[in-house]
Design a protein with these regions (language model features):
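Membrane-anchoring hydrophobic helices of lipid-metabolizing enzymes
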Residues: 2-84
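Catalytic core of membrane glycerolipid acyltransferases/transacylases, capturing the structured
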Residues: 34-38, 42, 50, 80-139
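Short, conserved charged micro-motifs
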Residues: 44-47, 233-238
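Active-site metal-binding loops of divalent metal-dependent hydrolases
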Residues: 166
């Protein structure tokens, strides 16, 4: 009874502490590091990606400190992914920042509105994050220029991760896919790695402000499978890649 009575207050306090991390850690620790990277790094884009990775690794370490009943399990094979287009199911706001925390060299798709936010937008642009137009409209004028750049980036060992559902699932089921990620993989002759994310929505549900701090949760990220360049992804329509990716995600959810 005591726990149920005070749980909303505890959820609010921990939520505010987690959001406070964004402000305090950025202002006092990471903004000076980003500024130094902008001025002195030989490869500014890669330096910003690395700083973003560290920023969110610290965030999840802080989350586990405040919420000791939350465990995070990452399959060893996930850390080894390089030079790939990564797709994953999408359950929570935590999903993209969790993937950022796993890969020092990464790019992803960010809503256009975030690029307009002062300072935050500068960080996103400097890290080389992409506009949704690249995956939503295959006829954008500079598509081939961006594809050429992406091909070189992937060849250097970087990863591009995308949530092909385009929005968080409210039911937990895998939603309809957009074809953009699969088109990029085809044009770049890049393999697709399919990741299964589980239980992030139990910690930070869609459409909620408060973190759910009162239940034991094991968040996991596992490699559901791969679609190689010569496995239907690089030949013909991206539809084959979409179908196989869905099969891998839906199949892994039954285990």
């Amino acid at each position: 009874m005591f726990t149920k009575t005070f749980r909303p207050a505890v959820d609010l306090i921990i939520t505010l502490l987690l959001w406070a991390y964004y402000f305090a850690a950025f202002v006092f620790f990471f903004f000076p590091a980003y500024s130094a990277a902008a001025l002195f790094a030989a490869d500014r884009e890669r330096a910003f990606q690395n700083l973003n990775c560290i920023f969110y690794r610290c965030f999840f370490a802080y989350l586990k400190l405040l919420m000791p009943r939350v465990k995070i399990s990452i399959s060893p094979g996930v850390y080894a992914i390089r030079s790939s287009v990564i797709i994953a199911n999408h359950l929570s706001f935590l999903d993209p920042i969790l993937l950022i925390s796993l890969f020092r060299q990464h790019k992803t798709i960010v809503k256009s509105v975030f690029f307009k936010v002062p300072i935050f937008g500068w960080v996103l642009k400097s890290a080389g994050y992409l506009s949704p137009s690249l995956v939503q409209d295959s006829d954008v004028p500079d598509l081939m220029v961006q594809v050429k750049s992406m091909r070189a980036y992937l060849a250097s060992g970087g990863n591009l991760f995308i949530f092909p559902e385009g929005t968080r699932s409210r039911s937990g089921a895998v939603g309809p896919f957009e074809k953009g990620a699969f088109t990029i993989a085809k044009l770049c002759s890049a393999p697709i790695r399919v990741l299964r994310i589980e239980n992030t929505h139990l910690v930070y549900p869609p459409d909620c402000f408060l973190f759910n701090t009162g239940v034991p949760v094991k968040i996991s990220v596992s490699l559901a499978g791969s679609i190689e360049c010569d496995d239907g992804n690089n030949q013909g329509s991206p539809l084959k890649g979409m179908q196989k990716a869905r099969s891998l995600l839906e199949g892994s959810s039954t285990h």
